[in-house]
Structure formats: C-alpha cells, structure tokens
Design a protein with these regions (language model features):
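Positively charged n-region of N-terminal signal peptides that target proteins for export
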Residues: 1-5
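Hydrophobic, proline/glycine-rich low-complexity stretches
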Residues: 28-87, 237-258
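Bacterial N-terminal signal peptides
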Residues: 10-19
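Aromatic- and glycine-enriched beta-alpha-beta binding-site module
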Residues: 86-162
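Interaction-surface and assembly-scaffold signal
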Residues: 138-260
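Hydrophobic beta-strand residues in large extracellular and virion-surface proteins
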Residues: 77-79, 105-107, 161, 173-175
Length: 260
C-alpha cells in the first residue's frame, strides 16, 4: 500500500509539472527570443551591505556601483539560495537530472553610459561555471526544508542551506521563521553576466514572496538565523563589517528563460 501511495504521489507531481510546462509553452510563440528552459523552485534571499572594494574587483571594466548613502565604503549585494525542484527543456524533458541546488551573488550596477543592470558576479553551483560563467564548482550544494503547520494556520519553517566550492569558499545558512501569506509578484527581468556583459537572459517569472524582515526588528518573523561565510574570496567580501538588511522567502517561483 505504501509503495502504491508513493507511486500515485509521483504521478501527480509529474503530471502537475507537465501541465505547468504546457501552459508556459503555449505562450512562447508570442516572444521573439528563443525559449530555453522552464523551472519550478523554492528560494531564500538575503540582502547585505558589504565591502565595496571587494565587490568592485569582481565587476567588468567600465561598470560601477553606487555606495551605500550612510556607509560610503559599502555596497549592496544579494545572496539567493535556490532549490530547483523541476527543470525542463523546451520539449518538456528534464535538464540534466531535472533538479538542482545552488547559490548566486548579484548586484545592481551601471555601465559607462549609465545604464543599470542586475549582474550575476559569483555563486556556487554543482553545474560548474554556469551560463553566466561566474559560478564556482560545488563540492557540496545541499538544501533542507521542514514545514510544520496545523489546519488553516500559517506554517513554521526551518531551512538549512550549505554551499561549499572546490576553492574553499562556503556559505551555510540555518534559518527558522513563521510564514505569512506571500505576495504574488509576476515580473519580466533581464539578467546580465558579470563576466561577459553582452550575455543576457530574460526571465519571465511568476512568484510569491514573503519578506521576513531583519532579525531583532519588531515586525520580524525570523525566530533564529545563523550564517557562516568563509573562504579566500568570500572572506574579503564579508570581512566582518557586513550588515544584513533583509531576508525574503520565495516559497514558489516559476521561471521561463529566454536567450536573445
């Protein structure tokens, strides 16, 4: 009986993924850029003020960042952990194993003409350097998530994210929080490689985000947080002067990727 129940659950999961993918494909003829991938994910993002010089060293020539107003030596940087539950190609077939876990670092920067872009400047991925050619190959890329809820109450969530690169850079997050009803935020954005800025990907996103706040703030729903960042590069960015500016949970995130 248990094996039969598991088989039914597996069939439902695959059927749901196929239906969502089919709905996404039906809209592709409306876009000029080639459609390359669809995914369903869960994400957790952290915003920081960090060492500006260490981040600027990772920017391409001619690009700059605006310093934090009340801390000129610092700039804003985001870390996003991703648990990609289902990843499909344009034919609806799994990309690789069909799932993946990794972490990316991104910044808002502008080129010499003053045009603003989101740049992916680093990360840790089991898939190697990735499409943006900036990720560090992972030796560990682990995600763990426990959800406890009763009836119609919102849930209590515990997460563990552990990312370790072959170079020795690492990020480990332990996070516990009380959920709220997330806000649905569909969007279309263009992301640019921090190494080869002529390479862009357009993301058509349907997501729901839950801003958890900052630990210790009166309106924060974060019960506990432990973050350890180390390694030859990351210890320069996170040199002890960093400040956490916000934590956001994205319990569901559906993305279509288009490449010009």
């Amino acid at each position: 009986m248990k094996a039969k129940k598991m088989a039914i659950v597996g069939m439902i999961t695959l059927t749901l993924a196929a239906l969502l993918w089919g709905a996404s494909v039906s809209a592709q003829t409306e876009r000029a850029d080639p459609y390359v991938e669809w995914s369903a994910e869960t994400r957790t993002s952290l915003g920081f003020r960090v060492n500006g010089d260490a981040v600027r060293a990772l920017l391409p020539t001619g690009w700059s960042m605006t310093p934090v107003a009340d801390s000129p030596s610092q700039v804003n940087l985001s870390i996003t952990f991703m648990d990609r539950h289902v990843v499909l190609d344009p034919q609806g077939q799994p990309v690789g194993t069909g799932s993946s876990r990794y972490m990316v670092m991104s910044v808002q920067a502008r080129d010499a003409d003053g045009n603003n872009s989101t740049l992916i400047i680093n990360g840790i991925s089991p898939e190697g350097i990735g499409s943006y050619e900036v990720y560090q190959p992972a030796v560990t890329a682990r995600a763990e998530r426990s959800i406890v809820g009763q009836a119609e109450q919102t849930s209590r969530v515990q997460e563990v994210w552990q990312m370790v690169s072959a170079s020795g850079d690492s990020v480990t997050l332990h996070l516990t929080y009380q959920q709220a009803i997330p806000i649905r935020r569909p969007s279309t954005i263009v992301i640019r490689s921090g190494k080869n800025t002529s390479f862009t990907r357009t993301y058509k996103i349907d997501q729901a985000t839950d801003a958890l706040g900052v630990p210790g703030a009166p309106d924060s729903r974060i019960e506990s947080i432990s973050l350890k960042i180390a390694g030859p590069l990351y210890s320069r960015i996170f040199d002890g002067s960093e400040a956490l500016t916000g934590v956001t949970s994205t319990p569901w995130y559906h993305r279509e990727i288009f490449i010009p």
